Amino acid sequence: SLGLVGSEMCIRDRSWGLIDGWGQVYDLDMLKAFYASFEKKIGRVRAVLQRPLTLAEKILYTHLYDDALLKKYKRGEDYVNFRPDRVAMQDATAQMALLQFINAGKETVAVPSTVHCDHLIQAYKGAGPDIATATESNREVYDFLRDVSSRFGIGFWKPGAGIIHQVVLENYAFPGGMMVGTDSHTPNAGGLGMVAIGVGGADAVDVMTGMEWELKMPKLIGVHLKGALNGWASPKDVILKLAGILTVKGGTNAIIEYFGEGTASLSATGKATICNMGAEVGATTSLFPYDERMKVYLEATGRKEVAAMADAVSADLQADAEVVADPSAYYDRVIEIDLSELEPYINGPFTPDAATPISEFAEKVLAHGYPRKMEVGLIGSCTNSSYQDLSRAASIARQVDEKQLSVAAPLIVNPGSEQIRATAERDGMIDAFLKIGATIMANACGPCIGQWKRHTDDPLRKNSIVTSFNRNFAKRADGNPNTHAFVASPEVVLALTIAGDLCFNPLKDALINQEGEKVKLRVPEGDELPSTGFTQGNPGYLAPAGAQVEIKVNPESQRLQLLAPFPAWDGKDFTDMPLLIKAQGKCTTDHISMAGPWLRFRGHLENISDNMLMGAVNAFNGETNKVWNRLTNTYEGVSGTAKQYKAEGISSIVVAEENYGEGSSREHAAMEPRFLNVKVILAKSFARIHETNLKKQGMLAVTFIDKADYDKIQEHDLITVSGLADFAPGRNLTVTLHHEDGTQDSFEVQHTYNEQQIGWFRAGSALNAR
């Protein structure tokens, strides 16, 4: 039953069973049905498209919501309805997703779905005490997620079980499949040949309720990999180099498909690393063709039956031979990378596309005056926490004792899953890290998502850290805007941690050991997979077991809040809106809705809205969280100003520059302005996931036709957006700026809304339009 008991939401149904040891958690019947029909579906696609197919096209066209939709779609233009195979959610975004799902009135999820508790654990003292603290401090949220999961048939991975993307790779990802996840690094599953796409919670709700899931047909970027890696080069360096080529927005609305002989030289987890960080170039997803390395990984993780089924259709789990032979005829853009010539890269600071080969990095550090001393090395995260990653890093750590070296900086390690941690412990890797003074944190995101209680006396001090993470935006890891965060492979992080010097190049530089001798670090080495197999440890998986469970959302809770529908559009133009903020420069979802200490409010829209745009830089004063409040004629915080406007019935508008909403998939960055009565986001361009999230929540997201019009907007303007009565696909709207001196400017703006999305806008949100 689903209903309200007094003023509390109450849901009763199933209890939980705990899977101990090596238990099957994937959906074998679903996979058997999938592979049994795959060749037939591919045949139908070939008959319609009448040309050779890329791997991405094979997966996309075999996942159309209905067979009647099978036709040729124009990349980058046509919106298409899909039927993904599964959904994955992490605990910070699952709260809002499940609060929305509760309102959908369904008895169970329509596709296999899971929740993973990895974001709410703060890294501080180490795995044991940190998990204990998180379990207690987040008990209300964990209980809610666990019990709602039980009620609706969703698998639940407890705190400490692992990072969502590593757990998905180990248990759920399968070649040729399609999944969505409420995290921007969901494309990690592309390492097993899956189209895996990061989405907001409302999109996940569409899939979980069995509705069609809409996506603009992506363009295709083909990356031809030649040769094989050697020396210090790692899979991470492939994507670090590519980020420099494509920039943070170069992959927007595109799938990056890797092909060529070089792909077969990379492990499945190495492929996953590359796909994972494709999010940093804005790609819809990334994927690799099925090969022997994927088969071996599937078998090593207890999925021999899945490997056998994939083997049977392996010819259709890669691009057709004609595509590989003439890629520029089938991809919208082709990039070539020779793995045999690739050197390690270090990217940053403050943006993941500032790519520098290690041979040039010292010069860059000195030229820009970056803090040369490396203060902390951090390895792990969903991007680099596989067995192979830790194995190669441990081979560097072991050289400290062997070569009588001292370690100059602290090392923090976040294993990717309990399976990885337990196996690494058995095989001596954890001990190798502990011997050089490392702190082993929980199998969780930790510092990568800002959950790091860093030991420092001066939290605003200018300093440098190097991580094997994916993002390095200002304030992201430790809340310090002056922390220069650089991204590299785990091997390079270990080398720089030992040296304590950003200018150290392990490929050519020597270190001075405790005997005063010059010694060089050997090239890292490590096993792709454990020779004696994985050990699971305590996996921490809870499966819905069918008994009754009761859920309560206390109306006085500061962590959870039931959602009320957003109001529908009133049929009028948006007139005389004050400018809330004109954001200058990079404005990611971290700037719009900060993570770190704010993660605890991710299930409470009113409370989380207090952080809205507090990290955005005001173009008129160069400061953060300081905007002009026309009601008080003073400078105040962004959310506080928006709250005052809302209380007076005043709508407002936000103006921004390029790639607004880059980064995380968190839909809170769209729901917060919607909640605080911001009607319009006007930007030079949007990141894909965030633009979709804005549309889902009934916001108006428009872009400048002439980007120079951004400069016309003044601090005290009242802004009108007109033409909404005739809002239609491809039809521009008009913005009029009423300046304080009585003059005005007017210009047209464009949008990407289709008929269905315009329906969301008119209804007030996608949920309202159901």
Segments predicted by a language model, with ranges:
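Accessory "access/gating" subregions that flank catalytic or transport cores
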Residues: 132-136, 141, 146-150, 154-181, ...
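Short, small-residue-biased leader/transition segments that mark boundaries at the very start
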Residues: 2-11
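Long, structured ligand/cofactor-binding scaffold of large enzymes
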Residues: 31-34, 38, 43-218, 602-654, ...
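Mobile "lid/hinge" segments at catalytic clefts and subdomain interfaces of large enzymes
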Residues: 22, 26, 91, 174-308, ...
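Acidic, glycine-rich flexible loop/linker segments
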Residues: 511-528, 690-760, 767-769
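Extracellular/luminal Protease-associated
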Residues: 259-264, 647-686
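Flexible inter-domain linker/hinge segments
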Residues: 19-29, 39-44, 50, 59-70, ...
